Amino acid sequence: MPMFMDGASQVLQQVLQTVLVTSEPAIVIPGSFLGELDVIVDEAKNHGMKLVSIPKGGITILPPIPMSESSLTRLCKDYYGLKTDAERLALFSNLEETFPTAPGVSLPCRLLYHPRDYICRIVHLCAELVTASDEEYQKAYDIVPLLHIRPVQNVCEELRRQFRAGALTQRLPLGQRVDVQFKRTVVHLDGSMDPFPRNAAEAAVNIAPVALDAVDDIYEGFDVTGTEVVDIPTGKVSEYLSEKDFELVTEDSVLLDPTGKRVQAIFIRGGIDKDICRRAAADVEGVATKQNMRRLTNGGVRNPDTGILGYYDYLNNPTKRKCRMTEFTRRNWGKIIGPCGELLQLLDQLYKENAPDHYELQRRVIPPEYMLFNTVFSTVSVNKNFRTAVHRDKGDFRGGLTALCVLDGNYEGCYLALKSARKAFCLQVGDVLFFDSSLEHGNTEVHNREGSWRRISIVCYLRCGLMSHTCETERSMRLRNQIMSDRLHADSADSVVNLNGVTGHLPPLCIPFKIAKTLSLTQHAALRFVSRRIKEGDGCVLALTMGLGKTLVSLTICYSYIYNNGPCDILIVAPKTLLQHWMQEAKKWKDYGLVFPGFIVLNNVDSSSFEDDLSNYEQQGTTTNPKKSYVFVINPGYIKSFLSRVKGFRPALIVVDEGHCISSKESKLREVLDSLYCSARVVLTGTPVQNNAEELYRLVGWVDDKVHSTLPQRDFNEFSNSINRYVNGDDSAFCDALFAQRYIHEWMSPYVFTVMKVDLPPLHDYIIICNFSAVQQKMFEERIKVDATDNLLCLKASEHRPYHLSTHPLCFLGFLTGIWRTGQVDIEEEPGEFEELGTYRLSRDDDALAKDCSSLLENGKLADFVALSGKLTALISILHSIFEKMEKAVIFSQYIGSQDFIARTLTAYKISVVTIRGKDCQQRRRRVVEMFRDDKNVLCLVVSTQIGAYGLDLTAANHVILWDTWWNPQVESQAIARCYRQNQSKAVIAYKLASGFEDATVLKAQARKRALFKCLINEETSQVVPGHDLVDYTSSEEDDDRRHLWETLKTCTLEGGKPAVTKIIRNIDTVKSERWI
């Protein structure tokens, strides 16, 4: 049985085993050879090993220390007190019986060192450094990995402190046995090791109820203090600021940005009583230690004295529990609750009085469970004698301000300077500065001599990470488990349960118990997120990738809202193509207790059924027909008609499905919904950004227009421009783009709940570049008047002719003559597009081509007919490879002509195919989907992209063929999600067929938009990969069947002699991305 996790490479396993067997430290550099940093950290931590971030750029891995810190301290003191080497050797010999000679793990060979020798090395190191000068100690600290391990570091510093206080004088009598107990490493049946046995009694001391609520029992004894990633600059040491470069501010003042709209700083002289500050300083000074990762903001010489009080999000740290109170806060709650609580509440009041807009926004977005002492602050950084170099605070809520207050000290200088504003603020004890911590800031020089000054300050803020999906899901899991455990003994499984009932911080979230058992953790977290926003009188955006159950979340929210508030009306706006889906979902979950007094799905205000429903609705309020709750699900096209028919309609809650349509600059729907004056707004979308960043700005502003006050349009546009520059290939814009990404993401995070990953089988997404046949290329150049390889960018986005031509020359002629125009195309074409074509008559050449095509079909020469189109040739080969495995495929096309042409061609090949068109009624669509799902002989479905890309469950197929590309890549993502969603048990393969025209124009636009989406939503710094850097993937393909298919496609010959396919590209390779969180 392997000793290490599957995520670790074999080389990493060997390295860790070597350290365990020999006790020799290993210096490693994260990368593909060993594994990424998080894998190395997780593996080493899981087995009790110690990790140190030296040398620069690398990590030193050390074996576990099998001795408690208190025992190690006592042993070091005893060792230091002995006079001779003989006495010291005798001391170590007494450890023989109490030290285990081998760890309890399965090793490749026996242990090759005695653990006593490892302890001897540590003890001697500490003893040697007891009398060392600070300079000597620092030199040792820079090169000795053991000094970076918390127990060893603490022991050394404690002994040095006692030596300077004159406490290390007692000698240990010779022959006295040392009573030292060593901790054994516990090995579990699953192969994992727990080097930290739980000490529940110690962990429970002085923990407030709120703290207990924030910490799982299993983590009570695990202290991650010092591993918080707090605004760490990477790379070179940060610069220090000099006061000569700044204008000094000594009196109350407000500093605005150059536009005069955005607050940069508010300085309040003597804002807090000095006695209150000093009392608080005495209680929180202990938070500030050198156990941190902020050396670069302290001149790069040594770690400063700093620490975290309150709640923190350990998102980048090797701990299973990511969001919780810090160790110091839990252990000292009873001590700090008085003076510190009073101080923070006074700061909270000052914040409210001096920056009401920022305060109100921060108060509304902070999760109640993270309100430290019932303030708008979740987290406090405590700094002691810390002159910070230039940095930006990366995790603070961008819609609010950070509060800085000096609590105690005796110093001169050390002004807080804002670099861009050229202002420095003179803060003394009791002074308060509220400022935008995203701006570059730092302290100027201290006038006092080295070591002769003292300054204790706090920085209070709201951590955005506490509102992240990780924290929401983590807490939801604990709450759900507790609820499920409590309800196991309930009398009735049909009862309603309050998901937020186990905490007093959140509004009631009452739903049927059967539904609660069904919801995923993501859905639980989304429900809590929405309920909190609605309670605050705001709206929110649920940006969940396709297949995560947005509809069920929405219905559950509607149920809870009605349950809590009594009779009311709720409006759900959904595209016409999704109305049937809403009806089916409502019917499906009715059996689970999700029952609504009135549920009306409206597609046409002229229908007789609507009149009957409306009559019942209007007759409410009488003695015989009391008021009840109604949920209306309405097609956007009928909103105006509905409102004119139902006078005075005022919904208490509005839900907009596929709500990215709201973000359109000229959205008529937004205007109509605004007229309803409903602030409780929920937008459902898997694609909050489709074309540009401004869509996101408008979307967030629609759910709560107050957020624009903290990030004006001008500032957002500057951020957007920085991101766009980098996305489009300007590497010099990287730093600006990264900052802009972080700022925008943190600014919107309180209002946008984002989950873009789903636990499904793999998705393999390919772009297949198809050639034109000789006939296609000639027609392209003559009829569309553009050379097939040049000047393609001049074509309008609404140009449809190239798409029909890429299907087949005969399809192109049919489009020109109007054969396919009877039902219009299935996209929103620009007005006048078809009028530009006029009445087209076939030329002699056209007529001859049509007759030749007919002749090929009549004579059974299907291969020659297909060879007139690169896409059609590729399609037939792809389908044959799919059907050989008895698997199913869905073909998406946006054009009626292409859909019909594909279906007819497949029928000629005796392939059983069914179709769904835009003109089909809902009943026929449902029958076709059921036939495709249940009939094993039906292997192919041809469907309109605009119809089939939304709401349908096509998981019977695991192959998706995108026949024609379009400028918005999110439409294609929606199409793929019809098959790649919950209930899919197989790997899904997507084939995007692209002609030379699409490769040169549409695919480039798609890559840019995908990169932008990743930047803004996926927390990735992304950039478009130039076309000349995209290599063919055929030789790199790991799957034998697919590699054979790619080779086959390249050998297929078109009319004119060209190969059908020129290149196979992975879609993921068109954008290069790097995670930044």
Curated annotation (Swiss-Prot):
Residue ranges, annotated region (DNA Helicase): 517-1075
Protein keywords: ATP-binding, Dioxygenase, DNA-binding, Helicase, Hydrolase, Iron, Metal-binding, Nucleotide-binding, Nucleus, Oxidoreductase
Cross-referenced Gene3D superfamilies: 3.60.130.30, P-loop containing nucleotide triphosphate hydrolases, Tandem AAA-ATPase domain
An example Gene Ontology biological process: base J metabolic process
CDD domains noted in UniProt: DEXHc_Snf, JBP, SF2_C_SNF
Positions bound to ATP: 544-551
Record EC number: 3.6.4.12, 1.14.11.6
Cofactor details (free text): Binds 1 Fe(2+) ion per subunit.
Domain named Helicase ATP-binding: residues: 531-706
Domain Helicase C-terminal: 871-1032
Catalytic activity, reaction form: ATP + H2O = ADP + phosphate + H(+); thymine + 2-oxoglutarate + O2 = 5-hydroxymethyluracil + succinate + CO2
Variant or mutagenesis effect after changing residue 391 to A: Impairs DNA base J biosynthesis
Cofactor: Fe(2+)
Signal peptide: none
Residues annotated as binding Fe cation: 391, 393, 441
Motif stretch (DEAH box): 657-660
Highest taxon in the source lineage: Eukaryota
GO cellular component: nucleus
Its biological purpose: Dioxygenase that catalyzes the first step of DNA base J (beta-d-glucosyl-HOMedU) biosynthesis by converting thymine to 5-hydroxymethyluracil (HOMedU). DNA base J is a hypermodified thymidine residue found in the genome of kinetoplastid parasites, which is localized primarily to repetitive DNA, namely the telomeres, and is implicated in the regulation of antigenic variation. Probably also acts as a DNA helicase. Recognizes and binds specific regions of the genome, hydrolyzes ATP and allows the DNA base J de novo synthesis.
Protein name (database record): Bifunctional helicase and thymine dioxygenase JBP2
Organism the protein comes from: Trypanosoma brucei brucei (strain 927/4 GUTat10.1)
